[in-house]
Amino acid sequence: QSQHRNLTIHIGCDSIVRGGTVWYVTAVVFRYGAHGAHFIFSKVNVPSYRKYDNKPDIFTRLFQEAVYTLEIANFLIDNNIFMKEDIVLEFDYNDMKITKSTPLVGAAAGMATSQGYNILLKSDLQMACKAANQICQSC
């Protein structure tokens, strides 16, 4: 268990397309109750996803954000760094109105909750996704 009773770990990912490259930033936010937070992040880039007709494949790009988020969370659990109850996964998918990310809400929420994680969606107060978005802007 975490040494700090009020510590929660928020993990979220955002992406941005620049030219023919997709940049993914996954942020891990250490939230100390009402006493502030800090974060670390990883940044990777891959070639832009395309459909068979050469149009951008937005679904694959957005789904990969959930995959990166879960990979980091599982790494932290598998290596006994944190416990699941300390972790909140954030998915930057809109559950309040219809957008390109809306179809991913069920898939991402299902993957995460079936593994026992707590989640936040775009309509919730997110820290990790906002931090990741901020870093994405400089990619």
What is the role of each PLM region?
Residues 8-10, 85-93:
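Short glycine-rich phosphate-binding loop at a beta-alpha junction
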Residues 16-19, 35-36, 60, 67, ...:
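Short acidic, S/G/P-rich loop/turn micro-motifs used as interaction or catalytic elements
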Residues 23-25, 119-139:
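C-terminal edge-of-domain segments
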Residues 49-59, 111-116, 133, 137-138:
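Catalytic phosphate/metal-binding cores of nucleic-acid and nucleotide-processing enzymes, i.e., regions
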